């Protein structure tokens, strides 16, 4: 359905893939239209399978009705234009057929003569009349009011003639019947046309009637003179004095005069020629009469300036946005001026170019204005090159969307020439480089005028068409001073001769979009590939993050039809496209884009009704320049004369007559930005504070000044002597106004105090001014001396104050604070500002970290920092986070543990070393787990895991002492009483020696049945079944024991306990037990069901270490995301010998949880939270 119409219309600059036919397919590069945008989120494929779906096209069926503003309400006479058009169209068709076929003329002779005599002019043979009727029928269907007037006048005239004939009488019965019937038909037609007057609303150009008359008169005169000359040359039997009249009758009289009135006949072939002369005159006149396209189909300077302003504000997402500045387009704006649509009218189709330009929120208003314009002039709306978001907007306005293909988008950050998939491009680039080609990349503004003139000359000489092509995806002007930000990429040979060029227009501030591609016939193979690759590889230095290349029409059809197992319809459709590719190079374009491994982004065509698809296709072919109509204005210089900019925007004086971009800051001030109206949507309390801020600024008060240190903290001020002069800074938490005296509560990190403002004590101003300028939550600096209120409350007697930070949003409830736990996490800054308990928690965490460091420093440990970004994930069994480094084009992992790097330091001789830092594990989130956490790892040479039992206990007890003032842990407790349930924390003593138990003994006690390291797998599985513990069949005995431990021991432990001697198979980095077979020297510290830390006697045997890591790597290769990868660098370091070492790993977050009795989300300042 219209495929032959849409394909060529999407080419970019009027060329095929190659501009020199001698090149082979290996160096083809697309040079057609393109189109970007992001996702296909808004457009879902039609639910009902159709032929377009089977072929690989996604036809978007419309289920939404047009908004009321886009269509006129249907009246009972809405059918009149179509009925009139069809009636006249049938007569026109029969008249044309009768003019070319004597047989048809003989068959319809009787009804034709009856219609001609009594109903409607239906001459014997006359091309002119046939074509005029066809144009009249089309105009009637398009609801042109001038066509209604022409038809009505014809009916009235015919009715008057019939009425006169009836009144004259003397006719035969047959003639009387015909005249009466004709008169009745005319009266009915006149009544229907008058009643349907409002259905013919489409306008034509002003003065169309006079222009049409002038065209017809000129054409008729030329036709009569030419026909007279032919009659004189070939008179046949026609009398000399009747030749001029005969010619005039045939040319302009529609052969209405009976041929018998003339003496003789000219040669037969002349009648057809005479009719053509008349046809040309009448067709020209009719076209001018019914034409609704504006004469100035172009942008004015103000229009272009407004478009550039909208692009600066909103154009960062639209790769086709810059093409809206093409000057042979017209534009229609939303009433607000925040969005617009550029378009061109061809063959009665108003063809919109891509997405609306401007604020997405104003797109519906721009589409509505465009549809109203189409309706006013009777144009059929059509869209070429819409993005997914744009097509969704057009759908919501009542149009249908059809996916045409995909645009190739390159992401320079991901582009590389290495890899098997880039072999073709790499080889082409190598060939071009061997030929000595280099690439030069410059902005147009950096090119001298004479050099740009040479560039334009080269572009014209290398073009394989007479004129530039393009509409929706081409700029059509090279070297214009207004396009100084465009990018020129040139391929230069060793003799400094330019052999090829790419010109790209801006796509926002960080992208470029291909506009022009040219190459010399002498350019070597791979020239285009070299330019594209060099542009992508050097994009970062140019500030480019995305490159829009060419458009692949029906890409999905090529791709799906070539897949293994593709259905017969998909293969047939692909075969048809391959066949047509002989002329339109469709497959070549797809493959030339595909070789760069781009991101494919869909583009759409939109239309109102399936019946207008051919017209939309023809309009796109004409607009793109593939079909040039007679008297086309395509190659003329386009400068519009009638600005379309809304008066509100034009009146600002920001727009420029030369089309240059306006001042963006000025556009923001007149409300053309996303911030327009923000304050009107703010809550009332926030709006009041913004208003107060504006008043302060207008009074010359800086609400956010440069800071200066206060002389005292609040705590120090409260401890200062009476009458001591102090200055403090803090946040206002409460205000009590008693007229001349005002009390406020001021809080800083150290505490809270009362400040007293008395008019008699203030150096300047009064308390009322303070009350008017400040709100709760404001930051202020207070100066004065310490004293007391009448009630004896220690207070700062204020002599001067300064606002140092205006709080523009109200604080939470001053009594209850933030009660919602999720809100406390997401707005931790507010939680800390109003909640003393939260400030205590963050202080306790700091104390824990400091105590851990001080304890280790006291024992001679050295603190180091090891890489967080690692090439391999190892050191623990956990799922890692993956990121990517563009410089080396490789994946990296956020470390799950620093162990392997710390052991490298141990090999180097660092005997006591630790790291206190962040680790990352892509696992669950709950009360005790966060994907990002703080981990302590410490290693001590010449020690084992047993030495770390006392060391770990000492670290935790010292941390508790620092945070709580005693070696105690806080545990949640719930008491139920008469006044309800009360939740609180109670201290638990954790001083002294903590229990130590083996893993197998603890499990045996929980099961009531003895197990050890020699217990078989079958027995362990039976015990799991009996205890209800799940397991996997691929697990070995060690993994099953670990599962029993986690379900039966770890989760039931309360007091801090060390569980030692874990199975060897689940401890890949731990040395085997020195005396027990099947277990490793490892312990886990557990308290109240949470593992706090673990320690190993580290495995220092490099041979055994390699064997175990190879087992882990096999698991990783088999799909286990938590298994460690083989780290050859680490193993090589171990082969240089590491001393016997004991290692400790401890989760600092869990230690803080133990000491404070809080969850991990409460103890972390900013735990990971789900997005809203």
Curated annotation (Swiss-Prot):
Annotated segments matching region Disordered: 1-34
Biased composition (Polar residues): 17-31
GO cellular component: cytosol; plasma membrane
Reactions mediated catalytically: tRNA(Lys) + L-lysine + ATP = L-lysyl-tRNA(Lys) + AMP + diphosphate; L-lysyl-tRNA(Lys) + a 1,2-diacyl-sn-glycero-3-phospho-(1'-sn-glycerol) = a 1,2-diacyl-sn-glycero-3-phospho-1'-(3'-O-L-lysyl)-sn-glycerol + tRNA(Lys)
DNA-binding region: 726-804
Transmembrane in keyword set: yes
Region (Phosphatidylglycerol lysyltransferase): 1-663
Main location: membrane
Membrane topology designation: Multi-pass membrane protein
Annotated compartments: Cell membrane
InterPro entries attached to this UniProt entry: Aa-tRNA-synt_II, aa-tRNA-synth_II, aa-tRNA-synth_II/BPL/LPL, LPG_synthase_C, Lys-tRNA-ligase_II, Lys-tRNA-ligase_II_N, Lys-tRNA-synth_II_C, NA-bd_OB-fold
Binding site for Mg(2+) 2: 1091
Chain residue ranges for the region called Lysine--tRNA ligase: 664-1172
UniProt GO BP: lipid metabolic process; lysyl-tRNA aminoacylation; response to antibiotic
EC code: 6.1.1.6, 2.3.2.3
Cofactor: Mg(2+)
Entry similarity comment: In the N-terminal section; belongs to the LPG synthetase family. In the C-terminal section; belongs to the class-II aminoacyl-tRNA synthetase family.
Role noted for this protein: Catalyzes the production of L-lysyl-tRNA(Lys)transfer and the transfer of a lysyl group from L-lysyl-tRNA(Lys) to membrane-bound phosphatidylglycerol (PG), which produces lysylphosphatidylglycerol (LPG), one of the components of the bacterial membrane with a positive net charge. LPG synthesis contributes to the resistance to cationic antimicrobial peptides (CAMPs) and likely protects M.tuberculosis against the CAMPs produced by competiting microorganisms (bacteriocins).
Protein name: Lysylphosphatidylglycerol biosynthesis bifunctional protein LysX
Gene: lysX
